[in-house]
Amino acid sequence: MAAASCFHALSTPARSSSSSLQSSSSRLPAPIKPNQLIIRSQKREETATNDAAISRRLALTVLIGAAAVGTKVSPADAAYGEAANVFGKQKSTEFSQYTGPGFKLSVPAKWNPSKEVEYPGQVLRYEDNFDTTSNLAVMVTPTDKKAITDYGAPEEFLSKVDYLLGKQAYFGKTASEGGFEQDAVATANILEVATPTVDGKQYYFLSVLTRTADGDEGGKHQLISATVSDGKLYICKAQAGDKRWFKGARKYVEGSTSFISVA
């Protein structure tokens, strides 16, 4: 978190000499009367008192300024007792590292391993304890491609692995409404595409929102990361329902697909 530091500009009041000598080459100084001595003595005492007060105020200001500069204030401290993790690295308590055959992956710490096999070549599946709609899977299949770009653009690649998004189960006649084409009860929209290169290896990343006519969960956010290495196609897919996506599941889905690395 960015720390707020306070800086105090200290200014020392300028002091001017209160006494000036008046002399004359032709006259001697006039004798000082007793009442004049008393007045001058009082002025000197007042000046000393003021100087002491100023010194104390300056000392206090210096101490406060030093404390402010030396203390880093975190906005989340008062409310939560710890710094907020905005735009920071993932906390170790939120993700655990999984090492599989030829790949490494960050898995949400609160998700459990699942034995359900949903896709060809699936070697791993984890799902949310409370909602199995939120899950991730890793698939490793043989390929004759040398690089992920050999599949064409990311959109072309997605069309070749569209089984990852689920198949339409109903093929009856339907009207064109609710954003669905005629006779279609499912739709998929690509929200984001990226082609990052990590350690000299190119990846495809796609964010897809799928919806079905039954309105289940308001749709599903499905994130796919894929690359090719040593004659194998590696795909990591993670998803969450639209409602849970905006209630905290997003960081787990994005974290899983963003931090997969293939040897």
From Swiss-Prot:
Q: Explain the induction of this protein.
A: Down-regulated in response to mixed metal ion contamination (cadmium, copper, lead and zinc), but not in response to zinc ion contamination.
* Region Disordered: start-end pairs: 14-34
The question of whether Ribosomal protein is a record keyword is answered with no
Entry keyword set: Chloroplast, Membrane, Photosynthesis, Photosystem II, Plastid, Thylakoid, Transit peptide
In which compartments does the protein localize? Plastid, Chloroplast thylakoid membrane
- Cellular component terms per the entry's GO annotation: chloroplast thylakoid membrane; extrinsic component of membrane; photosystem II oxygen evolving complex
Q: Does the keyword Membrane apply?
A: yes
* Regions of compositional bias (Low complexity) in chain numbering: 14-30
Q: Which GO terms describe its molecular function?
A: calcium ion binding
Transit peptide residues are 1-78
Q: Which GO terms describe its biological process?
A: photosynthesis
- Per its UniProt record, what InterPro entries does this chain match? Mog1/PsbP_a/b/a-sand, PsbP_C
Q: What is the similarity comment for this entry?
A: Belongs to the PsbP family.
Question: What function is annotated for this protein?
Answer: May be involved in the regulation of photosystem II.
Task: Report what the protein is called.
Answer: Oxygen-evolving enhancer protein 2, chloroplastic
